[in-house]
UniProtKB/Swiss-Prot annotation:
GO molecular function: identical protein binding; threonine-type endopeptidase activity
Stated name of the protein: Threonine aspartase 1
Keywords: Hydrolase, Protease, Threonine protease, Zymogen
One of the GO BP terms on file: positive regulation of DNA-templated transcription
This protein's record includes keyword tRNA-binding: no
Annotated gene: Tasp1
Null allele phenotype: Tasp1-null mice are born with no apparent respiratory distress, but the majority dies at postpartum day 1 or 2 with no obvious milk spots, suggesting a feeding defect. Newborns are smaller in size compared to their wild-type littermates. This phenotype appears in utero. Animals that survive the newborn period are markedly smaller through adulthood, and display skeletal abnormalities.
Hydrolase in keyword set: yes
Upper lineage: Eukaryota, Metazoa, Chordata, Craniata, Vertebrata
Any one annotated GO CC term: cytosol
Length: 420
């Protein structure tokens, strides 16, 4: 598929709604020929959040995306399942103090960390998730374990295994299944604590004093950009392995100063992530991971909407229309001034390899895209043949309005795959 270029041209794509203006951005096509030798193949695309990423921290965001890609590819090359690889990428993202997931997550109103995470397997369609989880360093590890335990079948006495646990119940289940706990204080960083104190002061001031709304709004926006506290940086990843199986995962610390017990899109089915292998009614395997304002993503079930849209012939156009019509212009968000979110998507299909006449190999065509309505989104991607991951911070062009405009970029990767 040939996609158009024009990153900073400012030329607009035709809007499908009076509420949405779409910004045309560069889409690079990458052609990667991957030989199947001793190491297995695969591809990973990760994101470190949609929101606002300051130039001063761009290096850190790109670095953690690069490490996450490398961890996933190491798993894929060793023959691991797509779910294992996507979980490995998320653990790396959660361990970074610069992301709002795991260590360094946003603090809630009580100054505590409560995390959400989920993972979905495109082959079995099984799903695992945790919400408002405290005391566990890597929430995605609990979600992954829930998925794996669920695939084993029913529990004793015919009980249905859980796929989604929250709060204290999720914590106890994790510890009972050998996942180590950690003191909550070890997950708080000086950055997250400073942001909490700063945001708490703003909240207390707003509650005590009636002030000019415009002036307050400008002050908040300025502070957010200076301190990078305006990011809605849920992290996520999508993976396809050498057999063509896909998986997706997402993890988040949630909104700053959220109410204790609040669960966002990162834990909810069809909202935070989605993965589905090709089937009788699906010509493409698809995987999606979202980021942004959790309430906006929940009310639009954006991950599943994007996955279904990607069954259309033109993935680029299908994703653009979904972001415009199903997100920005969604009737479920009609009262919102600006709709903030981002997605990474991957779709794959098998086709005959022109360079290899062997009957036991096919080319796995992988199309990958990212799109956002926020000011920026940080992504990284890598195939099993690549020596290192590529990273990029996508930004809306000058003049585009966050919450009302759409940026979209992506590429294509070709992998050699064994025939099932």
């Amino acid at each position: 598929m040939i996609m158009e270029k024009g990153m900073n041209s400012g030329e607009g794509l035709p809007s499908r709604s009076s509420q949405a203006s779409a910004a045309k951005v560069t889409v690079k096509e990458l052609e990667t020929q991957q030989p199947c030798k001793e190491k297995r193949g695969g591809f990973v695309l990760v994101h470190a959040g949609a929101g606002y990423h300051s130039e001063s921290k761009a290096k850190e965001y790109k670095h953690v995306c690069k490490r996450a890609c490398q961890k996933a590819i190491e798993k894929l090359q060793a023959g691991a399942l797509a779910t294992d690889a996507v979980a490995a990428a998320l653990v790396e993202l959660e361990d970074s103090p610069f992301t709002n997931a795991g260590i360094g997550s946003n603090l809630n109103l009580l100054g505590e960390i409560e995390c959400d995470a989920s993972i979905m397997d495109g082959k079995s369609l099984n799903f695992g998730a945790v919400g408002a989880l405290s005391g566990i360093k890597n929430p995605v590890s609990v979600a992954h374990r829930l998925l794996c335990e669920g695939q084993k079948g029913k529990l004793s006495a015919g009980r249905i295994p859980p796929c989604f646990l929250v709060g204290e119940g999720a914590y106890r289940w994790a510890v009972d299944h050998g996942i180590p706990s950690c003191p909550p204080s070890t997950m708080t960083t000086r950055f997250s604590l400073a942001a909490f104190k700063r945001n708490k002061r703003k909240l207390e001031l707003a509650e005590r004093v009636e002030t000019d709304f415009i002036q307050l709004k400008r002050r908040r926006q300025s502070s957010a950009k200076e301190n990078d506290s305006g990011t809605l940086d849920t992290v996520g990843a999508v993976v396809v392995d050498h057999e063509g199986n896909v998986a997706a995962a997402v993890s988040s610390g949630g909104l700053a100063l959220k109410h204790p017990g609040r669960v966002g899109q990162a834990a909810l089915y069809g909202c935070g992530c989605w993965a589905e292998n090709t089937g009788a009614q699906n010509p493409y395997s698809t995987a999606v991971s979202t980021s942004g304002c959790g309430e906006h993503l929940v009310r639009t079930i954006l991950a599943r909407e994007c996955s279904h849209a990607l069954q259309a012939e033109d993935a680029h156009q299908a994703l653009l229309e979904t972001m415009q019509n199903k997100f920005i212009s969604s009737p479920f968000l009609a009262c919102e001034d600006g709709v903030l979110g981002g997605v990474i998507v991957l779709r794959s299909c098998r086709c005959s390899s022109e360079s290899d006449s062997s009957q036991d190999k096919q080319t796995l065509l992988v199309e990958f895209l990212w799109s956002h309505t926020t000011e920026s989104m940080c992504v990284g991607y890598m195939s099993a043949q690549d020596g290192k991951a590529k990273t990029h911070i996508s930004r809306l062009p000058p003049g585009a309005v966050a919450g009302q405009s759409v940026a979209i970029e992506g590429g294509v990767c070709r992998l050699e795959s064994p025939v099932n």
